[in-house]
Amino acid sequence: MHLLGPWLLLLVLEYLAFSDSSKWAFEHPETLYAWEGACVWIPCTYRALDRDLESFILFHNPEYNKNTSKFDGTRLYESTKDGKVPSEQKRVQFLGDKNKNCTLSIHPVHVNDSGQLGLRMESKTAKWMERIHLNVSERPFPPHIQLPPEIQESQEVTLTCLLNFSCYGYPIQLQWLLEGVPMRQAAVTSTSLTIKSVFTRSELKFSPQWSHHGKIVTCQLQDADGKFLSNDTVQLNVKHTPKLEIKVTPSDAIVREGESVTMTCEVSSSNPEYTTISWLKDGTSLKKQNTLMLNLHEVTKDQSGKYCCQVSNDVGPGRSAEVFLQVQYAPEPSTVQILHSPAVEGSQVEFLCMSLANPLPTNYTWYHNGKEMQGRTEEKVHIPKILPWHAGTYSCVAENILGTGQRGPGAELDVQYPPKKVTTVIQNPTPIREGDTVTLSCNYNSSNPSVTRYEWKPHGAWEEPSLGVLKIQNVGWGNTTIACAACNSWCSWASPVALNVQYAPRDVRVRKIKPLSEIHSGNSVSLQCDFSSSHPKEVQFFWEKNGRLLGKESRLNFDSISPEDAGSYSCWVNNSIGQTASKAWTLEVLYAPRRLRVSMSPGDQVMEGKSATLTCESDANPPVSHYTWFDWNNQSLPYHSQKLRLEPVKVQHSGAYWCQGTNSVGKGHSPLSTLTVYYSPETIGRRVAVGFGSCLAILILAICGLKLQRRWKRTQSQQGLQENSSGQSFFVRNKKVRRAPLSEGPHSLGCYNPMMEDGISYTTLRFPETNIPRTGDAETSEMQSPPPDCDDTVTYSVLHKRQMGDYENVIPDFSEDEGIHYSELIQFGVGERPQAQENVDYVILKH
């Protein structure tokens, strides 16, 4: 029964713990590391079903008290509803909240802080104690260097330096060193302050070489000021192929035949250790040579060559630099090689002495039929012209610094002479000109054996009309050489004969010397007449432009080129054989527009209503690309083509026009050209009709007026005679006054106006009444008592016609005021007249 008690209590506690743990969930690093004087940053998060957190207590090494059912220990931090109670040192800061963040910071941290930190969390419904391990050392603990499993030379690797520490309030840095010297490669440093891990890491990438093998790499922990705190070191294990060097005895690797040579393959470094050794000569492996030392006893000349050693390990083979071994020996027995054998008399023969030796022979001795040939000490003996006495046995002896070789078997020279004194004869008279037919014959003095055939060179499609005769039709130009050979068993070639064909100059062409670019008007221009060859070489030059001879020099110069110099040029080169002309070469001169003028179609006088085309003609190269038109007021017209078309043309278009042309070189403008637009017959007819009608109407009115006036006068005259009254009538005609013609202005153009005014003016004079009788009027005395309603009047009239031309643009020769003045004075009978005011009435009749 007593045994069941503790187990039952344990089960109850486990159940309670399990029930509480289901309500709480924490995440934080399991263990945190620091050192005396540093700080600790504890990232922490939690999740509780009851988020109403009432208190938070941070214990150091907490222990559960069964009696009080509470935890005992040093309280580093406490937070309750009543407020915060800071620790004595005020080192602990709670950086979280009452929701999910339980992050803490201890700064500074001490060694006695090591142990367990207990986070006591209490809510209304649950409690929980979360434990965190803290490890604080007296001194800064070293970082840890992590290397890849294997490092090979020239392969990039990453070195990692890891420190299980990071705190926001305590900055640190990690420094890489190689053999105590800071490494040049840039390292990448990163930190982690998460609920999973807290660390500072530095990664360094570099490509190790075999020389780095065994070197010490250090990762040094420093504070913010660069002060050393701790470090970690590792030794690099760089896998590499064997590194080799050959040592030769003698050191210059030059020995004489029969001497010994020792070559030692020194392995300066190999990781891992080498396993196989081999030697190579000229790239081929030497058999049974698998040690680091190669001994060559009594070397021969065949052992000369390039030697190297090859040593392999698990990484691969390593090969040393090549050593060239030279084995020196005296010349071996000589042999003679005869070139061009058998030899023909007159030909050339070359003898070559061949003997193997190292170093090469420096002196040779030649023998002819056992007799030393004086002055022949070279490797080759050349006889330019073999004669019959040159036949026989030839041998030689070679010599170098090691000794003199032996004379080998001789070589026999068999001289069989071909036909002697073979000559090629040109049958034609000289000189030979291009296109001639040339006949050559092959002659000789003697031959043994007899001549059986002839050969010619060079070969061509030539004709051999007979044995030993060659005929060349239409011989070509150039320094052609012909040689013939008279052949028996061998051929004997005659000395080549140059046909020396003369020809006219060839490949004549015109070449521009300057300028190198486009030719503009005013440039200095030089043309060169070139040709490839001429025979004879004495030549003359002629320049021609458009069929006209210009000069007789090889170069044609223009100090200041003008557009008139443009054209087709060709040059002629002649010698005593003939002349050759070049292809026509066009000289193009670029210049601004010039000689501009305005041409008018159909002419400079155009009837209104028709069409008129103004064309801006110019001389330019390149052609005009832009035209501008201007009127007589120098106003630019909105036309930019070469032709200005006016359709239909009007009288208002009359005036002066000019144009301006522009190209890539410059611009130019034309002089003024006047366009006159005159009236059409229809317009003139209409205006003449209107003018004639107006004049006719005025004339009719004037005639009618005169007739009416005369009738009125007769009527008044008759009434006066009947009334025995005295009256006087008279006409007054104005004196014609010559006036200066109207000035003709520049714009005296217009239409006839038929409505010009003619005027007839009337005037009436009234006299006061009088009873004084007139003397001399006895015949009319019975009429002296006029009726009381009659009054004395004088009627004065003027008929005035204004002189004017029929048309407004036709001015009369003179202008004058001409009028017919008619006046009639009537004196009525004497009698009592009523008092009346004297007055003058004017009447003006206009028509």
Swiss-Prot record:
Predominantly monomer of isoform CD22-beta. Also found as heterodimer of isoform CD22-beta and a shorter isoform. Interacts with PTPN6/SHP-1, LYN, SYK, PIK3R1/PIK3R2 and PLCG1 upon phosphorylation. Interacts with GRB2, INPP5D and SHC1 upon phosphorylation. May form a complex with INPP5D/SHIP, GRB2 and SHC1. PROSITE patterns: IG_LIKE. Disulfide bonds join 161-219, 265-309, 353-396, 442-484, 529-571, 616-659. A motif (ITIM motif 4) lies at residues 840-845. It is found in: Cell membrane. It comes from the Eukaryota. Phosphorylation of Tyr-762, Tyr-807 and Tyr-822 are involved in binding to SYK, GRB2 and SYK, respectively. Phosphorylation of Tyr-842 is involved in binding to SYK, PLCG2 and PIK3R1/PIK3R2. It holds the Pfam family Ig_CD22. Residues 1-19 form the signal peptide. Glycans are attached at residues 67, 101, 112, 135, 164, 231, 363, 428, 445, 448, 479, 574, 634. Residues 709-847 are cytoplasmic. This is B-cell receptor CD22. The keyword Phosphoprotein applies. The gene is CD22. It is a single-pass type I membrane protein. N-acetylneuraminate binds at residue 120. The lineage of its organism: Eukaryota, Metazoa, Chordata, Craniata, Vertebrata. It comes from Pan paniscus.
